[in-house]
Amino acid sequence: MEVGEVILTTQQLKQVLTIEPDNQEVYKLFNKLNNPFVVGAPVPPDRFVGRKSLIETAFDQIYNRSNLAIWGGPGMGKTSFLELLASPDVWQEYGEEPSQAVMVLFSCESIQPFTASGFWQEVLIELMDKLDSEPDLKSDIETLLDQGKATARGMRQVLGQLGKRNKFLVLLVDDYDAALRENPHYTQADIEVFLSECRSIAYQSREREYLSMIVTSLKRFNELGPSLTPDQSPWYNHYLFVVLRPLTETEVDTLLQGIPITPALRDVIQNMAGGHPALLQIAGSLLFRELRTGKLPDTETFAKEFESQTRHIFQDIWQRCRDVEQGLLILMAWSKLKGSLEQKITVDLSDIDLVFSQQELDLYSLEQQGLIMRNQDLEKPVYLFRSSIMEQWVIHKIQTSDKASLEKWETILLKLINP
């Protein structure tokens, strides 16, 4: 049921209860109308909004048995997107035939501690659960697992068997960052071997025609994983890279359609959420909760509640930024900071525009992460925070910093000024 339909049905049931307050059947129906916005969990495929071009790109890659790497910051909808691609209904909606595809979806974070053998074991176990119609192949996979052959070589054997049955594997891997981090059981050398094996299967082996691999990460791969050397091909060059950007205004309108909000409240949501999918789900959930009680919150009350509900997201975003990115965010907020910090931070920041002109790549990275936007209507680019709360969070973070933290920010800012 669409958001607008849920709200309309809620209003109709409330009218009935006004006339018949003892009608228990209507009361039960009223309580069953769940909030259509999803907070703290992936958005189900039937409530997924937008990303049409990216969905089409993903199906193009699957059709060609090629590979896709999707990256985006916290809450940008990576897991929701993978779950969408795993839905047979979505395949049919986009004119694709799901019967030959065996779809396996899991998160690398579920493998603790992450190891290459743990990865292949997880793939084979999940694959086995999808092969009830192929008992012989299911038995072969079980034998591989029992014999401790959950390896890249074993995976190639299974892909070959899938191909003989006119099937192929769509491997949807969330949180691929975990495969690029060392741990006590997974060394840098192990990482390099694992990535080489993945590239070999997906790009070089005969069995590649029975596999399409789609992975997600918080950052683009060239910022993660092993460094490249002149004598090696990039370990990630078999992927097409796409970034999950904030939702467009049209997509935001679609998400919030049917909610009778004032233009002022709509502007507050746009200003505070900035098109960020997780923030918009929280905003929609808060609004729906209030509407179900028969009232619409005023902008000030809504803003306070929204800020309280989203503080952890902004903290997560900040902590995941590199030092140079944090420094650039501080510079963007400097006009509102300098009055209270000019005695504490003594770095000469009189020519911030020059710093920005020298840091275009890192600013572009922040732009792609959906944290800032560039206004190019003026003679020179002007960078703005996408979310007013993110700007407030940066300001508060610096204003409440102790001496050691302020010295750290000074060092970062000096490096930006003198690259």
Please tell me what each predicted stretch does:
Residues 71-104:
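P-loop NTPase Walker A phosphate-binding motif
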Residues 67, 150-220, 228-230:
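Conserved Walker B catalytic segment
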Residues 52, 261-361, 365, 369, ...:
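Winged-helix-like regulatory helical subdomains adjacent to P-loop NTPase cores
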Residues 239-265, 283:
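Conserved small helical "lid"/interfacial subdomain of P-loop NTPases
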Residues 388-418:
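Short, amphipathic alpha-helical interaction segments positioned at domain boundaries
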Residues 102-104, 108-136:
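Conserved NTP-binding/hydrolysis module of P-loop NTPases
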Residues 25-49, 53-54, 136-140, 234-237:
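Conserved adenine-nucleotide phosphate-binding loops and their immediately adjacent elements
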Residues 125-150, 175-186:
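Conserved P-loop NTPase mechanochemical-coupling segment
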